[in-house]
């Protein structure tokens, strides 16, 4: 989980059909865990109501961890004044809701095949990269492919955005599948 804002965790209750009789593993910061326990307290009771999604919360910090042998590297970024995580998995990185990435954290994003990064709109925003800021970050990091995500209604339509980006950069869309190698 990147952070606890509702647009990133609001679907937790909809995970019911995927939990079955086992707790779904979730990896997150301690502060995000505390927020989710407050908001979704019914999921963490000793005897939850039948059918309620249940989770196994795995607290992580800004150090690599492994899931079934796959190395996951948290990348701390700033979402306004809020520190949140993006993630690098192999040569793939997912960064959303970022407004700043420190030089130290950028080092974790070197030599990427695929970068997915937020680009809210043209107009600057205190907590999200604008289109120009996202494009600057893409130029700075030089991934082989980049996808713009977390686009708001002010970003323009998909075909308009496609005409504004250079080769190797695309606006992402809901349901898109992006492949990358380890």
Language-model segments: residues:
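Binuclear metal-dependent hydrolase catalytic cores
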Residues: 1-95, 161-182
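Structured catalytic/translocation cores of nucleotide/phosphate-coupled proteins
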Residues: 3, 10-16, 115, 134-135, ...
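A broad detector of the eukaryotic-type serine/threonine protein kinase catalytic domain
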Residues: 17, 120-121
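Short, acidic Gly/Pro/Ser/Thr-rich loop/turn segments
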Residues: 34, 81-82, 101, 122-124
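Active-site-proximal loop/helix segments of hydrolase catalytic cores
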Residues: 78-81, 90-118
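Binuclear metal-ion centers of metallo-dependent hydrolases, dominated by the metallo-beta-lactamase
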Residues: 102-114, 121-182
């Amino acid at each position: 989980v990147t952070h606890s804002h509702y647009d990133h965790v609001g679907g937790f209750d909809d995970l019911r059909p995927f939990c079955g009789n086992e707790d779904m593993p979730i990896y997150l910061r301690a502060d995000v865990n505390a927020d989710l326990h407050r908001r979704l307290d019914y999921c963490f009771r000793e005897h939850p109501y039948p059918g309620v999604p249940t989770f196994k919360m795995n607290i992580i910090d800004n150090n690599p961890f492994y899931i079934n042998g796959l190395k996951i590297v948290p990348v701390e970024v700033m979402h306004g004044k809020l520190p949140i995580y993006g993630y690098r998995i192999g040569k793939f990185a997912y960064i959303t809701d970022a407004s700043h990435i420190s030089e130290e954290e950028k080092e974790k994003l070197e030599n990427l095949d695929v970068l997915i990064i937020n680009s809210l709109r043209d107009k600057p925003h205190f907590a999200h990269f604008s289109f120009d800021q996202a494009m600057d970050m893409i130029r700075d990091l030089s991934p082989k492919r980049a996808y713009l995500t977390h686009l708001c209604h002010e970003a323009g339509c998909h075909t308009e955005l496609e005409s504004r980006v250079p080769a190797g950069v695309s606006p992402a869309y809901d349901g898109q599948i992006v492949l990358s190698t380890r």
